[in-house]
Amino acid sequence: MRTSTHKSGKDKNMNQLEVLRESLGQCDEIILDALLMRNRIVEDIMVYKEANNVPILQPEQEAKQKEWLERRMQEKRHKNEVADVFESITRNSKKIQARKLFNYNIVLIGFMGAGKSTISDYLKTVFAMDIIEMDQIIAERAGMSISDIFETYGEQYFRDCETNLLIEMQSRTNVVISCGGGTPMRECNVAEMKKNGRVVLLTAKPETIL
């Protein structure tokens, strides 16, 4: 009798669990539909801005959204978790805008100190674009610094790594590629940059670079 009662209680608990899971699934459906609708609205906003010459960047709107969320989440549970979700939503909205604006890669060239990292960080903040730091990637893959690569394998090897990485980047779109100072010295590298990107030359005063 106890076995039967124990089994009945276990079945009841399992039924409750299934009901909760079903409710969770319904929440996921609502969230998914809302996200898809939101993304479509973001695209419509971009179309409107282009048609009416409205500035693409409107940081005050993002500030208003943050203020709204803070007001809505006052005294509520899981405040940090909800904030993380909305941060991700905002970041993905920026990505949608970036894809609309830049259906190509942005390739930054210039001497060290010309501002490539500064511009890259700005584009990452404003449009949530992925950043490809060529020197950093080559160093990470080699497991050594750029200077050690030169010393161990020679400049020719390093330049070949640059060329191969640029070729690899042809499979990517809507990313910022920050090139090493000597990358454009190879004509074939420039050709690769232009295949799927817009090349931006950054300049600076000699005293800034040196």
What residues fall within each predicted segment?
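Conserved phosphate-donor/acceptor-positioning beta-strand/loop module used by diverse small-molecule
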Residues: 193-210
